[in-house]
Amino acid sequence: MASSIRRGRGAWTRLLSLLLLAAWEVGSGQLRYSVPEEAKHGTFVGRIAQDLGLELEELVPRLFRVASKRHGDLLEVNLQNGILFVNSRIDREELCGRSAECSIHVEVIVDRPLQVFHVEVEVKDINDNPPIFPMTVKTIRFPESRLLDSRFPLEGASDADIGVNALLSYKLSSSEFFFLDIQANDELSESLSLVLGKSLDREETAEVNLLLVATDGGKPELTGTVQILIKVLDVNDNEPTFAQSVYKVKLLENTANGTLVVKLNASDADEGPNSEIVYSLGSDVSSTIQTKFTIDPISGEIRTKGKLDYEEAKSYEIQVTATDKGTPSMSGHCKISLKLVDINDNTPEVSITSLSLPISENASLGTVIALITVSDRDSGTNGHVTCSLTPHVPFKLVSTFKNYYSLVLDSALDRESVSAYELVVTARDGGSPSLWATTSVSIEVADVNDNAPAFAQPEYTVFVKENNPPGCHIFTVSAWDADAQENALVSYSLVERRVGERALSSYVSVHAESGKVYALQPLDHEEVELLQFQVSARDAGVPPLGSNVTLQVFVLDENDNAPALLAPRAGTAAGAVSELVPWSVGAGHVVAKVRAVDADSGYNAWLSYELQLGTGSARIPFRVGLYTGEISTTRALDEADSPRHRLLVLVKDHGEPALTATATVLVSLVESGQAPKASSRAWVGAAGSEATLVDVNVYLIIAICAVSSLLVLTVLLYTALRCSVPPTEGARAPGKPTLVCSSAVGSWSYSQQRRQRVCSGEDPPKTDLMAFSPSLSQGPDSAEEKQLSESEYVGKPRQPNPDWRYSASLRAGMHSSVHLEEAGILRAGPGGPDQQWPTVSSATPEPEAGEVSPPVGAGVNSNSWTFKYGPGNPKQSGPGELPDKFIIPGSPAIISIRQEPTNSQIDKSDFITFGKKEETKKKKKKKKGNKTQEKKEKGNSTTDNSDQ
């Protein structure tokens, strides 16, 4: 029967093969599907009937079927809807092993007419196989004498999956002695080595337990572990020692034969044969003890050998020796003190049959934790056992049946208060005296994320000095979470916000694990004085809980900014300034005021002023206010004083170390009548670079220079002509010749008494532009000059000719220039013209006398430049007002630059002629003079100009 069946199957197979070969020409096709491995039964693969172009109604009549030689039962077709589905479990690793490609090939056959279709179903790999090590525990023996960097090769894990799912990475648990070294042999394999990083000492560390974890690259990741046990070998240098020298044991007198009296446990710090201990009774033990007790040489257990009788002996003293197997061997000793109890009872027995541990801290009341069974071999009252539990615990015992108890939860748990309970269950019988037995139940409370991370205080104040190095550690925040494990794993982050126009994260960062706060860039006190932000602490629980703490970072100022001198007016540099002071001023006259600012704060911005006196400057008649910066005269000036003074003012802050700046004030002493109503001030930098007159119109300067040059040439020519003509009587007072000093802008007359002081002084600053009308004699025709005394020539300048006018280009230049009064440079008041330099401070009246010690945070008003010619502080013109008169530096004449109405009378006396009209008349009368005298006068004029 079986033979016929096998023959029938063989015939059917051959017939099927012939039909397939015959139908190959009739019709064929190929479809390709994909399905993941481990797909459940009924998983959709594809609409095979639709893809083959077959109608659902003809599937059954045409005998639609699926044939496969090797995997016929894995896939099946639903003839009702023509869907190819998974029929049974598909395991890619079982089908194809580690092959990169895995497919199931089936043939679909239909009759009427006969057609064969080839269908290929690709099985896609999923990460269903974790990495597997050859063994779960690997033991390695290391002698304590092994050198550092000693290597021990390890065998890696294998993963049955392919591709990324089989890409493994390794991680070794932290250890102070060993680390893992991974070297790639080729693209597919890696060699692992355990490297000794710290010397071993077996007496301190006998064993080292490591855990090697292999993780694949799939999602989700699967891991495999191997425990590595490293044993440290040693020599026999330690003797066996018992836990205690005397063991006290009590036994019932009816103890059965073979009852364990005590189990000795001697320890030897050595390893291997050196730590193997053999136990034996002492050599001086009596024969009685040897007949009643026996000791196991390996385990150290002492058991009863014969019947014990309380009436025969109440106690026994047993000497025990422990000897190791080292060479040479070493021994240790102890004594067992055995006392017999004269009680003829059996103690109850307690057993725990089931446990449900650990228990969650949010478990509901009444949760059953353990089932406890008690028993007693006695009968009657002596066998009736009751159980009790350790008091004051959140558990209770509930009796269910006789001798059966349930340990249930009686009150709420809080793992943060108590993380584990060690319960003692006591079983007591009803005998007299009663006997009892106890057992311990360890209950661990599982954590629930019910506590948010907490900071020690809600706000911290941090002080950081400015100019810190980038990335420096400024503070550490620390939050504590009362939960455990992942629920207590706290991570830190910044609560992002904007600080001005920048993000907070551009200033500081916080380490997610340690909570260390770092400054990402140097902080600048002048930019940010207080940086207030929040740090968030969040645990890793589900759902996560978090809290915030506020950090106030105060940026402390450092003395990193030197005092900066303020320019006298906008557009000029700060450094040196020239001042003209009349000889007639008295003590306390304010010459100038030095103003400076310091970008720092506190003592670092508190500025003081002092004069730097050189050699020979003991009689200098000037002083500077310590905190006001006002330069004033200390006494009345006399002829013994030098006509030129170069004052070097040192501006110093109070930082550590102190920073300084210097200002140079050039003071020229002139006659009272010749002192200009407003002095021309030009500033240069501390390095002595030339300052530019940026506030005076360029065209005006060019015009004045051109006119002045023409005037110089005219005066020189006129002087030569005058010297060649014999002077007439009455033109000069006898015995008092007048010296004419020429400059680039004109000439002026001084008496013989003052000519040496003025003409032979130091060179004036190049930016001083002076124009004086010539005070020369006009000959006998001028009756007015004949009546003037010498002092009048010196003290009174000539009035300009009333018919002098500006050229058209010069007037256009003046109208298009910046108004000087609008810039605060020139102003007129009741006390005469004052010169005020623009400052950044508020316009507050200056103190008239005395010095006031500024506060620690001295402001700009006390540290900026202010210069004024004389006392008084007249009101300044308002912005946009055009000054009535313009003062040419160095000239007592005033040029009007205001637009006058057409119907108004122009006062021609307000204009300077520079003697041009007068000289034109005299050119017509000029004669040839002595050439030698002309050269001599030119030489004197040049010398005088250079001295000025």
Swiss-Prot record:
The residues on the Extracellular side of the membrane are 23-697
Fetch the CDD domains from UniProt. Cadherin_repeat
What GO biological process term is on the record, naming one? nervous system development
Xref: Gene3D superfamilies: Cadherins
PROSITE patterns reported for this sequence: CADHERIN_1, CADHERIN_2
Q: Where is the signal peptide?
A: 1-22
Q: Where do the PXXP repeat units fall?
A: 734-737, 797-800, 830-833, 871-874, 889-892
Q: Which GO terms describe its cellular component?
A: endoplasmic reticulum; nucleus; plasma membrane
Task: Give the Cytoplasmic compartment stretches of this protein.
Answer: 719-948
Q: Where is this region: Disordered?
A: 754-801, 829-854, 868-948
Q: Name one GO molecular function term.
A: calcium ion binding
SMART domains given in the database record: CA
Where the record annotates domain Cadherin, the positions are 30-133, 157-242, 243-350, 351-455, 456-565, 588-678
In the UniProt record, the gene name given for this protein reads PCDHA2
UniProt-recorded name of the protein: Protocadherin alpha-2
InterPro entries xref list: Cadherin-like_dom (IPR002126), Cadherin-like_sf (IPR015919), Cadherin_CBD (IPR031904), Cadherin_CS (IPR020894), Cadherin_N (IPR013164), Protocadherin/Cadherin-CA (IPR050174)
Give the compositionally biased regions (Basic and acidic residues). 783-795, 907-921
How does the record classify its membrane topology?
Single-pass type I membrane protein
Its subcellular locations are:
Cell membrane
Note the superkingdom of the native organism: Eukaryota
Which residues does the record list as glycosylated? N257, N265, N362, N548
* UniProtKB keywords: Calcium, Cell adhesion, Cell membrane, Glycoprotein, Membrane, Repeat, Signal, Transmembrane, Transmembrane helix
Q: Which residues cross the membrane?
A: 698-718
| Stretches the record annotates as 5 X 4 AA repeats of P-X-X-P | 734-892
Species the sequence originates in: Homo sapiens (Human)
